[in-house]
Amino acid sequence: ALNLYHEARSERTAGMWAVGDVTINRVKSISFPNTICNVVKQGRMYESWKTKRYPDLSEEERIYYPVKGKCQFSWWCDGKSDVPEELDSWYRALDIARLMIDSDIGLGLTDGADHYHADYIDPDWNDHMILITTIGNHKFYKSIR
């Protein structure tokens, strides 16, 4: 739900659902991690100085943070608070996320897209993708395999 909120809170329901669709498509792909949380948090991490200085700590006890600007979803590693402030959008994101997870469905709005970006930017990576559709302020792409 946090991913839907931060990536598409200004979008209509279809735009928010499409972002969720991409997240689910990534979970189902062998090219990405196999859980929603790991898909959202995918990217470079660094270990906190608080745990790095203790070599005997287990991996579960270590604290990691995302490297700013080096993650799949920009809100995850932008250094800002992730606490939702726009409650109407947050509740809508929660409802959509619950529906998608509980029913294990997507509406197929993105026809299998596994990437997207805001329509006001033109990243280099989209040169190697197939443009599927535009929904709201986002363009959705499918990887060429």
Spans of features found by a protein language model:
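Bacterial extracytoplasmic/cell-wall-associated proteins, especially those involved in peptidoglycan
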Residues: 1-145
